[in-house]
């Protein structure tokens, strides 16, 4: 039976490249001269540091620009609370969401079942597997999910006949 997987993945190396480009741009920009603005990465978590809220907003804008240039969808970014650290300096945690969370997976399964397409969808960890009798029906399911789910960038992988 033909099947495919619905996943949400972000390449860790592309994140690293975007963060490196951000740090390089911040170090050379005139409006950040003498500033301690920077970004650090640990796996899928980013920490943005700046001297004040305004500069933190600018660092976030630069981050989104760099992600877009590296073809990373910015919908996968989840901003955390802004924290004050020593003096006037501020820090913000930004999480890169990967994997299809259970709430979104249930929403996808409900969407597919309510569409009356002859396919079955099941949750397998952070992946939603969709199986059907014909390839054409699976392609209709892909179009349905692409058109309806917009809160997280989804990829359709492992298409098998």
Swiss-Prot record:
Bilayer-crossing regions: none
Keywords: Nucleotide-binding
Alphabetized Gene3D superfamilies for the sequence: 3.30.70.860, YajQ-like, domain 2
Pfam families linked to this entry: DUF520
Any single Gene Ontology cellular-component annotation: cytosol
Entry superkingdom: Bacteria
Gene Ontology MF: a single term: nucleotide binding
Matching NCBIfam families: PRK05412.1
Purpose of the protein: Nucleotide-binding protein.
Record-stated family: Belongs to the YajQ family.
Protein's recorded name: Nucleotide-binding protein NE2248
